[in-house]
Amino acid sequence: MSDRVGRRRRRPLVLVLAGAALAVTLAVSGSAFGGAKACGTVVINEQSWSGSTANTYVAKYVLEKRLGCKVKVTNVTEGLPYFQAMRDGKIDVALEDWDNTLGESGIPYVKDGSVVVVGSNGITGVIGWYIPRYLLKQYPQFKTWKGLKGKESIFKSPESGSKGMFLGGDPSYVQKDRKLIEGLGLNFKHVVAGAEPAQVARWSQLYKQRKPVLFYWYDPQYLNAQYDLVRVELPKRFKGCLDDEKQPGNAKKFACEYPSYGLDKLMSKKFAASGSPAVKFVKKWKWSSADQNFVANLIAG
């Protein structure tokens, strides 16, 4: 964690982790910390978003301080790579999976039992298209996707040419916005700034300049407390609607809103059967999006 937090902030952050860990500890049964078996090493995968970092380091604190575990943190990319790593025993636990990464990549691993879903982490995730509230006040029709039609040029950027810019998310995230734009018949060019920090830098700069910006975003996310953002209403979901643009299918099949996601905890089959006291703790782990955002905000500085 030393690469994430400067020395001047380490002690306050340790106190925050301790406080968050206490809240998590109180939320689970005392039996989660029982058992004579030694904990051993637990490998937790930290994904690239801030909420996952908060999950990982609060759990790490509890497991090390209360159960005597040795916790190793990995950073394997969301999707197929981390399901394969879990199958191969390189990852024991993931504390925030967005519905088996939103697509088909994880389903075979769950079906064959090599990856075990052990319940919700207590948080519901939302993905969508977002604009600043100041823009909605100027253009009330932007409340829905239909209001964007014919007004795309308002969002023009150097990269988008004559089209409006839609700022896509971190390329490692499962998304469908290229297909969604096509399916809705909107005149946007999908532009990628890079990983999430680069995307945030781009849209937050435009926000501070009070310029138009439309972008992929999600909740919970601690930055949502710092920026007044509004989710654009997309078409309602329909049977057969697709959510991963890597899936085959006509663009019309992607022309619906993202679903809400119950954020699951996952374990490898080997770890789930290990008898480690950490297994019981992870199964019982839950906290709120408010708690997660609070810790994520402090970690991010």
Predicted regions mapped to residue ranges:
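Ligand-binding pocket segment of bilobal, Venus flytrap-like solute-binding proteins
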Residues: F83-A85, I91-L95, M165-D243, Q247
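Short, well-ordered beta-strand elements
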Residues: K37-G51, C69-N75, K163-L167, V282
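Short, polar/charged alpha-helical segment
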Residues: G51-C69, I181
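A bilobed periplasmic-binding-protein/Venus flytrap-type ligand-binding module shared by bacterial periplasmic
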Residues: I127-K137, G262-S274, F281, N297-L298
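A conserved helix-loop-strand patch within extracytoplasmic ligand-binding domains
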Residues: S114-F166
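C-terminal region of N-terminal signal peptides and the immediate post-cleavage residues
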Residues: V24-A38
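Bacterial N-terminal signal peptides that target proteins for export
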Residues: S2-L17
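Pocket-flanking alpha-helical
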Residues: T56, T74-G113, R202, Y222-Y227
